[in-house]
Amino acid sequence: MGETVTLAAADGHEFGAYRARPKGKAVGGLVVLQEIFGVNDHIRGLCDSFAADGFDAIAPALFDRKQSAVDLAYDDDGIAAGRLMRRGVGWDEPILDIAAAIEAVSRSGK
């Protein structure tokens, strides 16, 4: 089972991420990207599953720039809220967050 960690992007923005590490030495690192529903049970479960297979898996919370800890349901309300959130975040800044997540797991398995 993983844990919530804090990462810092190149622009200084601090954001949450869910990180699940394997019990032994990692075979590699993976960045799991959220859907419009945030880092929810499904995304955390994917990270845990990858960790069980030997990977250091991390899912950056890409909506943290607008609202922290977004965890939406797979229903009409969740879809509507997720679409609004995605439009509000844009594309450029989340790339910085993804780069920070890549850096966090880049040495795993080496």
Regions found by a protein language model. Give the residues of each.
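N-terminal cap/leader regions of alpha/beta-hydrolase-fold enzymes
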Residues: 1-110
